[in-house]
A protein has these predicted regions:
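Conserved short alpha-helical segments that host acidic/polar catalytic motifs at enzyme active sites
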Residues: 1-245, 249, 261-268, 272-292, ...
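Structural beta-sheet core signal
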Residues: 4, 36, 160, 171, ...
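Glycine-rich oxoanion-binding loops at beta->alpha junctions
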Residues: 68-85, 272-285, 309-345, 351, ...
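Extended hydrophobic-aromatic, low-complexity segments
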Residues: 181, 305-306, 322-323, 352-355, ...
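Active-site phosphate/pyrophosphate-binding segments
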Residues: 259-263, 267-295, 385-514, 587-607
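Glycine-rich phosphate-binding loops that contact phosphosugars or nucleotide phosphates
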Residues: 289-431, 435-438, 518-562, 590
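Generic C-terminus detector
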Residues: 556, 566-607
């Protein structure tokens, strides 16, 4: 959610900090600020609102900075309303900090500090940490930080400055991600690589419970006992162009158009000898044969990808699969055992609820497989097995290509599970893989012809509410389509299993209400068409997403969206593209900030 940056080097740092913060805008925020060493003091500038209208405008009225070290922050309000006073950095002149996460025991800390004579100005939990650092300060910043974080409960990452230690910045974390970037004669801290990729591709992952002491010459890592930790340098595999729009109006549109390539990068390395291969992570056929239950856990779009996985695994492997929302999984006392497999899906690898679900599964002894996009992320490190989707950075808050490759992984897993359990033979598995390998070209056809999606979007922009319906795999897909639309167009939408309409929801249908029907499954087509007729009779405006060979009465469908033919089982990978583009163009026609929808954050690192 919030974004942290920091710099120490030879260059004037204000512009670097602000530029790095702009790279973290996709994470979501409501205020921003920086703190830098100026002379013998720490200078802080912060403002409510977006960077351009808030912090950057405020900095234009400030005297020229000469500082070469500082920290910065974009805040997503959790404790205290969005305001200048609640913005970060927060400190008292001697200490300044930026903070991502939630301090669960901040009230207790605050009461203690008030008893010691400290006053509080903001409504934030962050201020309790800043004042506790000041209270514990003994001249040694590492000792001070270790004593302080030992008393903090919750998930957090911190960037810290001490007035008496110029040209040094410090970092610490528990759960919430933070990296330390290594440049030439300069060092950085950041919530993720996107913030610093313009300056360096080399970085260290800060481990939970570790403290980093950073100067222009390098970094020293300490554990909670002040022992020095040796860290391996990581190298980002993508370049700065991947984090730029490249001529597209929005990152979301760019990322939708990148999906054919993202699919190839995810699918091709996992095929060996024409068969899906999971040997790199240790997921053997013997394991797949012996798992008693398979659980798939995720949030939002990741959970929807898991729903596709459930349908496909059950259909091919005849193995029961449970799909759970991560925030529910850990609290419902799941019936897990050591012979169960829990598949954890997360784009960032830092989603707090999903990480907590993973830790629960590990604690019970179940096998865990993480499907993530970010190498070295918390979920990747915590899981017993991990597979990377290799989709490249996804900047838009609204997930598109990450969902696509997560769903593709579900197919690869389903094929291997079915083969390992002798539900399909080798020839059948090879045929499925062959057809899956053709999906990128079919997705490309959907991406190339966007006029039909724009036409549909122009009819949706005035809607107050709409429904998505489908059956089987189409229902799983309708859930994702509905989420995309509501996320960025702010139009209320719900997805329903088409057969459930008559059990109550059909009472909502009135003249002109849009209903988007996903109907790609030939064996369910007639049933879905009967539901389409039901809503059409009651005045609905019907958009139908279907394969190009499907026949229908023009009186029943107002706006058909025709798709390239593929095996029914694989159609979710094709049909999701029109749903993404319909949502995109609806929001764009309404002149909304497509990449940064209100109240949403890209990486939800708090529970």
């Amino acid at each position: 959610m919030c974004g942290i940056v920091g710099y120490v080097g030879a260059k004037e740092c204000t512009a670097i900090l602000v530029n790095s913060l702009t790279k973290l805008e996709y994470r979501g925020y409501d205020s921003a600020g920086i703190a830098v060493f100026e002379g013998d003091r720490i200078k802080t500038v912060k403002a409510k609102g977006k960077l351009k209208e808030g912090l950057i405008k405020k900095l234009e009225n400030e005297p020229h900075f000469t500082a070469t070290a500082g920290i910065g922050h974009t805040r997503w309000a959790t404790h205290g309303e969005p305001s200048d006073i609640n913005s970060h950095p927060i400190g008292n002149g001697r200490v300044s900090i930026v903070h991502n996460g939630i301090i669960e025991n901040y009230r207790k800390l605050k009461e203690f500090l008030i008893s010691k004579g400290y006053g509080f100005e903001s409504q934030t939990d962050t201020e309790a940490v800043a004042k506790l650092l000041d209270y514990n300060y003994d001249g040694d910043p590492i000792d001070t930080i270790i004593r302080t974080i030992a008393d903090i409960e919750g998930a957090y990452s911190l960037g810290i400055m001490f007035r008496e230690h110029k040209n040094r910045i410090f970092a610490a974390r528990k759960e919430s991600p933070l990296i330390v970037g290594k440049g030439k004669g300069e060092m950085f801290i950041a919530s993720d690589v996107t913030a610093i990729i313009e300056y360096t591709r080399e970085y260290y992952l800060l481990e939970p419970g570790a403290v980093a002491d950073i100067t222009a010459d390098g970094v020293t890592f300490y554990d909670m006992h002040k022992n020095v930790i040796e860290k391996e340098l990581q190298v980002a595999t993508w370049d700065v162009s991947a984090a730029e729009k490249g001529g597209y109006a929005h990152f979301m549109l760019k990322e939708i158009c990148e999906q054919p390539d993202a699919l190839k990068k995810t699918i091709n390395p996992r095929i060996k000898g024409g068969m899906p291969d999971f040997s790199e992570c240790g997921l053997t056929d013997e394991k797949l044969r012996n798992y008693h239950h398979i659980y798939i856990v995720g949030c939002g779009s990741a959970m929807h990808a898991g729903m596709v996985g459930k349908y496909v695994i059950e259909k091919l492997a005849r193995t029961p699969v449970v799909v759970d929302i991560a925030s529910e999984f850990r609290y419902r006392d799941p019936l897990l055992a050591p012979d169960d497999l829990v598949v954890i899906i997360s784009q960032s690898g830092e989603t707090a609820d999903t990480l907590a679900a993973l830790k629960l599964a590990n604690s019970i002894g179940a096998d865990t497989l993480a499907i993530v996009n970010v190498v070295g992320s918390s979920i990747a490190r915590e899981a017993k097995m991990v597979m990377y989707t290799l989709a490249g950075p996804e900047i838009s808050v609204c997930s598109t290509k990450a969902y696509m490759v997560q769903a593709a992984f579900m197919y690869l897993l389903a094929f291997r599970v079915a083969y390992a359990r002798n539900a399909i033979d080798e020839e059948q598995c090879r045929q499925l893989i062959s057809e899956l390998s053709q999906i990128p070209s079919k997705v490309q056809k959907c991406v190339d012809d966007q006029t039909q999606y724009q036409k549909v979007a122009s009819k949706l922009i005035s809607a107050d509410s709409l429904l998505y319906i489908g059956r089987g795999l189409d229902y799983a897909l309708s859930m994702e389509g509905s989420l995309k639309l509501k996320e960025i167009s702010y139009i209320h939408s719900e997805s329903y299993a088409a057969g459930e309409l008559k059990h109550g929801t059909i009472s909502l249908i009135e003249d002109g209400m849009p209903v988007i029907a996903v109907a790609t499954q030939h064996d369910l087509y007639e049933k879905t068409m009967s539901n389409i007729k039901e809503v059409k009779t009651r005045g609905a405006t019907v958009v139908m997403v279907c394969s190009e060979d499907m026949k229908f009465d023009g009186n029943d469908v107002d706006y058909p969206v025709m798709l390239p033919l593929a095996r029914d089982l694989l159609m979710p990978l094709v049909a999701v593209v029109p749903l993404q583009l319909i949502a995109y163009y609806t929001a764009a026609l309404k002149n909304f900030d497509v990449d940064h929808p209100r109240n949403l954050a890209k990486s939800v690192t708090v529970e």
